[in-house]
Amino acid sequence: MTGVDDISSNVHKLVGVTAGMNTAASTGPMNLVLDKCSVVLEELRTIQILTETHSEGLSEQLKMTEKNILEMENLFDQIDQLCLFVQKAKSDLDKLEKLYNVVDRQ
């Protein structure tokens, strides 16, 4: 039964420390640990906020990059169409020039 008594005693001491029922001398190390934990918790919260803000900014940049890539793809498609048009126009112009030369010779 000593194990149960030890656990019960430890639980009572813990409740006494957290409830402030013990003297300040006995809670000094616990207060130090709690203070350090509070500081670390605040730092972690700050890091969380900064990370969330940074990730939102990255998300917006990613959306803009995707939009720019789509615009570039459309631009390349239009360039390809323009090349085809120029080739066809050059071919038509060559044919007209040959026809003109034939008619001019007659």
Curated annotation (Swiss-Prot):
It comes from the Eukaryota. The keyword Coiled coil applies. Signal peptide: none annotated. One of its GO terms (biological process) is endosomal transport. One of its GO terms (cellular component) is BLOC complex. Keywords: Coiled coil. Residues 53-106 form a coiled coil. Belongs to the BLOC1S4 family. Component of the biogenesis of lysosome-related organelles complex-1 (BLOC-1) composed at least of blos-1, blos-2, blos-4, dsbn-1, glo-2, mutd-1 and snpn-1. Interacts with glo-2. Component of the biogenesis of lysosome-related organelles complex-1 (BLOC-1) involved in gut granule biogenesis. This is Biogenesis of lysosome-related organelles complex 1 subunit 4. It comes from Caenorhabditis elegans. The lineage of its organism: Eukaryota, Metazoa, Ecdysozoa, Nematoda, Chromadorea.
